[in-house]
Regions:
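Short hydrophobic-aromatic micro-motifs
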Residues: 17-18, 121, 165-167
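Short, solvent-exposed loop/turn segments at secondary-structure junctions
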Residues: 23-25, 87-90, 126-128, 140-141, ...
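Conserved metal-binding segment of the jelly-roll/cupin
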Residues: 158-173
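Catalytic core of non-heme Fe(II) oxygenases with the double-stranded beta-helix
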Residues: 95-158
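Non-heme Fe(II)-dependent double-stranded beta-helix
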Residues: 1-111
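Ligand-binding loop in jelly-roll beta-barrel domains
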Residues: 176
Length: 176
């Protein structure tokens, strides 16, 4: 089962990183299968693979990982559904992804509610200089779009291969 500190951290900070969530051998399997489906997105300088659930059993296994289910159910409740399932690869030289929260956040009168959540699997190391995901801890509680200076308060989500990062959809996040 998922260590309780991750449930507490996602409530307090809006995100958590679970290290050693899967093996390096499994990361290799995921990478190999994912690269078969990657397509270049020349407009943003990234590679993407969409609709992964239908692309092979390994992607079904990933969606049903016990840590993934535990945190998504904590945030969204037992009747959640999988809306988007993509893989992406952003070279360090690619443009940043501006700070944002995920629709439908913010939604007036819904303070504290979570309508979506995200999980990122580190099939490679996410280092300080690799253009990692950025988050502003605690902003999932604000129920508003990011401030103009949000990036100045952001922290890098640095994690070793085999980790899973997850966050509340209202959390301000982007990419370096």
């Amino acid at each position: 089962h998922l260590p309780v500190e991750h449930l507490a951290r996602i409530e307090e900070d809006g995100y958590t990183v679970i290290e050693d969530a899967f093996s390096e051998a499994y990361a290799d399997e995921i990478h190999e299968e994912l690269m078969v489906h990657m397509e270049d997105d020349a407009t943003r300088g990234v590679q993407k693979a969409a609709m992964l659930l239908q692309r092979g059993p390994i992607f079904e296994e990933m969606a049903l990982h016990p840590y993934i289910l535990a945190l998504h159910q904590k945030l969204l409740g037992p009747d959640m559904n999988l809306a988007h399932y993509i893989g992406s690869r952003k070279p360090v030289v690619a443009d940043t992804h501006s700070m944002h929260n995920d629709p439908p956040h913010p939604a007036p009168g819904t303070e504290g509610a979570c309508f979506d959540s995200t999980a990122i699997w580190a099939i490679t190391d996410f280092g300080e200089d690799d253009g990692p995901t950025l988050v502003v801890p605690g902003t999932h509680k604000l129920n508003r779009k990011p401030d103009a200076d949000a990036i100045e308060r952001a922290v890098k989500v640095v994690m070793p291969r085999g980790s899973i990062a997850m966050w509340h959809g209202a959390l301000w996040h982007g990419a370096a």
